[in-house]
Amino acid sequence: MSLFDYTGEALKPWAEAGYECFAYDIQHTRTHRDGISFFHADLHDSATVWTIVERHAGKVGLVSAFPVCTDLAASGACWWAGKREADPGFQERAARRAMQCAEIAEAMGCDAWYVENPVGALSRLWRKPDHVFDPCEYGGYLSVTDEHPLYPPHIPPRDAYRKKTCIWHGPGFIVPPKRPVEPVQVVCARKRTGGTCRYAPQAAGLGGKSQRTKNIRSATPRGWAAAVFEANFIYTLLRGR
């Protein structure tokens, strides 16, 4: 199962292996494609969350979650003061929603879970992350002929880019070993100097605040997804999930 998951990329390796997969996100309409059942769900609504827990309790082998990072990511720190003035509890509320993902997994009887968020306030408001990686560090799990299936103009083949990503996980989750590839060399969009851009290419090459831009910038690294499956699928079999 995957929460706050628009692309479904975190589930694709599992679906391809024959697992029953469910993706919940407010952007979805109810549909089934590529072996994944997508459901519209407002995961900020407690009644919706409880319905999901009751539906899947005792049947879930692994839960991945990608809660909204708009109010938590360090990249948006310059706006925090203004947001706090308008709504003093905005950040604590966002952190609580992220932490709730772990509670959902545990309530379903699944201790193999992980919550993903970029570097930011969640490390202070919840706890330090259990694992940190750049997408390029798992690019070796993808084919040498890889091309991103959804956003090829923006996301390099084999996830060959840097974007510091934090993982909080449960005791049943196995952190996969890294298989790094060399990150792409690009021109920094702001300083016009050569070298490895300090921004992910999809951040440097996109502008505006559209939902599509947000989806591209937050797309699950596919190398990480493949690595998670490879490291964890045997344990889901042993648990009988």
Name each model-derived stretch:
Residues 3, 42, 50-57, 69-240:
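Class I S-adenosyl-L-methionine
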Residues 5, 26-29, 118:
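An acidic- and aromatic-residue-enriched active-site/binding cleft used to recognize and process polar
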Residues 2-8:
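Class I SAM-dependent methyltransferase "Motif I" SAM/SAH-binding loop
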Residues 16-54, 125, 130-132:
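Adenosine-cofactor binding site in Rossmann-like domains, unifying the SAM/SAH pocket
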Residues 64:
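A conserved beta-strand element that flanks and buttresses the S-adenosyl-L-methionine
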Residues 13:
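Rossmann-fold NAD(P)-dependent oxidoreductase module
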